[in-house]
């Protein structure tokens, strides 16, 4: 499939945070956003994910299994700074909610909850309340959401911030596997995460200028 952003611009108050942002990604490709704090990286990710409405421009998807009625966000997973998991529910209940709520992209199937737990290195504890877990364990299970409901585009905002090297290595393997299966990754991250060959988009804030590398 193809993910295309055309001339995106987002305003905060009277001023644009950024404008005229365009890019196109196809199967197996990744784009990493760089730039200083406040340059609009998180805002761009949230806009592409459909969580913020752009002042100008649009995001579109095209490819096999995509019809005219499908919203682009139906092809996306968004993993931001928050885990988006209920502390009073068990891990299994949380993952079941996201598996059912998000659903799978047409033609693909997510992995079982127990399998996802094993992949993120935490097999055997999905019966525990999410709130009982350490911060690192909670973050790993938030990453498992990417696995239980299969979607081709991963939008990642500093997904491994403050985690240890083992978690970084685990998530790097997940990202590489996703790209190897033809997935697409759009990320703001200071960690390599298997994205060394990714395209780069430098955000410059109010200047509205982007630089490809």
Swiss-Prot record:
Enzyme's top EC category: translocase
Catalytic activity: heme b(in) + ATP + H2O = heme b(out) + ADP + phosphate + H(+)
Entry binding sites for ATP: 35-42
EC id: 7.6.2.5
Keywords: ATP-binding, Cell inner membrane, Cell membrane, Cytochrome c-type biogenesis, Membrane, Nucleotide-binding, Translocase, Transport
GO biological process: cytochrome complex assembly
UniProt keyword Zinc, yes or no: no
SMART domains associated with the record: AAA
PROSITE patterns to which the protein is assigned, alphabetical: ABC_TRANSPORTER_1 (PS00211), ABC_TRANSPORTER_2 (PS50893), CCMA (PS51243)
GO CC field: plasma membrane
Start and end residues of each ABC transporter domain: 3-211
One Pfam family here: ABC_tran
InterPro entries noted in UniProt: AAA+_ATPase, ABC_transporter-like_ATP-bd, ABC_transporter-like_CS, ABC_transptr_haem_export_CcmA, P-loop_NTPase
Domain of life of the source: Bacteria
Self-association and partners: The complex is composed of two ATP-binding proteins (CcmA) and two transmembrane proteins (CcmB).
Homology family: Belongs to the ABC transporter superfamily. CcmA exporter (TC 3.A.1.107) family.
Listed PANTHER family: ABC TRANSPORTER I FAMILY MEMBER 1
Name of the protein in its database record: Cytochrome c biogenesis ATP-binding export protein CcmA
């Amino acid at each position: 499939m193809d993910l295309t952003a055309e001339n995106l611009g987002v305003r905060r108050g009277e001023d644009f945070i950024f404008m005229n942002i365009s890019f196109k990604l196809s199967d197996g490709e990744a784009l990493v956003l760089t730039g200083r704090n406040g340059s609009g990286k998180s805002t761009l990710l949230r806009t592409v994910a459909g969580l913020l409405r752009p002042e100008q421009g649009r995001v579109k998807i095209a490819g096999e299994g995509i019809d005219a009625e499908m919203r682009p966000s139906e092809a996306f997973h968004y993993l931001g700074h928050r885990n988006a998991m209920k502390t009073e529910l068990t891990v299994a209940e949380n993952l079941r909610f996201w598996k059912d709520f998000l659903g799978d992209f047409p033609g693909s199937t997510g992995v079982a909850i127990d399998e996802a737990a094993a992949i993120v290195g935490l097999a055997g504890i999905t019966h525990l309340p999410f709130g009982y877990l350490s911060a690192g364990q909670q973050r790993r299970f938030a990453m498992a959401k990417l696995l239980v409901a299969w979607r081709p585009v991963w939008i990642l905002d500093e997904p491994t911030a403050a985690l240890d090297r083992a978690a970084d290595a685990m998530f790097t393997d997940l990202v590489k596997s996703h790209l190897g299966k033809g997935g697409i990754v759009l990320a703001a991250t200071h960690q390599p995460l298997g994205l060394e060959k990714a395209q780069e988009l430098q955000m410059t804030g109010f200047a509205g200028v982007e630089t490809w590398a």
